[in-house]
């Protein structure tokens, strides 16, 4: 998945509107949190057996909220100058140690409870 054209489009969108001045870590994390809450709202009070229909009926709204989350996350990554692939690789390696396959496979327990 090459996200370069998408990231460039996000960057241009903000530059054209001179919004970079508002994109500081505090406000970006707040915006990110709000967008995640809006995504959560799509599933609020739904029972497990209702989720398939909920997703089907609200797919466009769910996709829009996920897009908002991704856009703010990518802004934050850019502002903080984070090498996202490297950060993800580092975090996965850390999680491999916390959640060894032999203890965590098929298990939803937190690493402290394994």
Q: Model-found features: residue ranges?
A:
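Flexible "arm" and connector segments at domain edges
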Residues: 1-66, 70-114
